[in-house]
């Protein structure tokens, strides 16, 4: 397997998440060693099969998950920027989950406290990134999106 996520990559992803979270007036996330380890293990599993698919919910406890694939070795900021760019499709007037905005809403979910991230390279040079969030965002209960996905501050 290729190289695993470096401390620099972890910090890049975390910094980008927290800069975006700040725009939405929600508390910063902290990196969690256990979540980093689990995300790393799963990114390596994805890289070995070269198939991008979410892990079974039962295997990640109460964690949410974002995934990213690129044909090259992607930077942490690039991954976070790509997930966050889904904000353009999010309707703050009609909050809720849609498949086209789930990466963005997971990133800025107010109640999420911790994250972990992993990256692995496949034999063809492509890279797989896994982010895990605790507690998970994108909870579809009544009122949860209104409370947790706040519009960016002016």
From Swiss-Prot:
Residues 9-21 have a biased composition (Basic and acidic residues). Residues 91-98 are annotated as: Interaction with CAV1. It comes from Homo sapiens (Human). Residues 14-132 form the SCP domain. Belongs to the CRISP family. The lineage of its organism: Eukaryota, Metazoa, Chordata, Craniata, Vertebrata. A lipid is attached at residue 2 (N-myristoyl glycine). GO terms for molecular function: protein homodimerization activity. This is Golgi-associated plant pathogenesis-related protein 1. Homodimer. Interacts with CAV1. It is found in: Golgi apparatus membrane.
